[in-house]
């Protein structure tokens, strides 16, 4: 959020606003803010959390604005978009900005949660199944040219480690259940639990730290 350079009063879109907590912080910085999310459930929660802020339903790939934005901000969203749709999404984001507009985003990059995904891949294989890599975690070298192709000038990009603590014995299992849904679609619940248990047991020696993952 600190990377935004537009002055107070600028029209800023929070793309993939979720529960609206960051949308609210953008408004507190003096911006005229619009939150956009594809989940009606999240939008209802955002409207409850943020009085006086406007929200609209829209997918990152094809959302449209009545008024072009001075800046578009996005946090922890873009890695959820399929690889095949990434360029289309970036083209659309650029199109929704005024000339000289800013796009500031944070999302999972190359190597994100790789130990977990690699172990899930091995455990799926042990059961005769393929673990689909559904998240998009690019390198800067891959993504910067895509941004430029969309019409952006890349001024700053950084790939950095950011450990996310999962509290308690079941923290990692809960994280997998919450965020890694697609690979388990249609799977018997008992098999799903077995694979998750196998995964966390194999990761225990490297990721478990006394009372958290």
Task: Describe the function of each predicted region.
Residues 155-211:
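C-terminal helical/coil "lid" or tail adjacent to the Rossmann-like core of SAM-dependent
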Residues 100-169, 185:
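Conserved catalytic/acceptor-binding region of the Class I
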Residues 24-27, 90-94, 117, 121:
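A structural alpha-helix within SAM-dependent methyltransferase catalytic domains
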Residues 11-62:
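Class I SAM-dependent methyltransferase SAM/SAH-binding core
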Residues 64-72:
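A short acidic, Gly/Pro-enriched loop at the edge of an enzyme's catalytic core
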Residues 1-10:
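Conserved alpha-helix/loop element of class I SAM-dependent methyltransferases that forms part
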Residues 71-84:
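A short SAM/SAH-binding and catalytic strip from SAM-dependent methyltransferases
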Residues 87-102:
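A short glycine-rich, Lys/Arg-flanked "PGG" loop and its adjoining helix->strand segment in the class I
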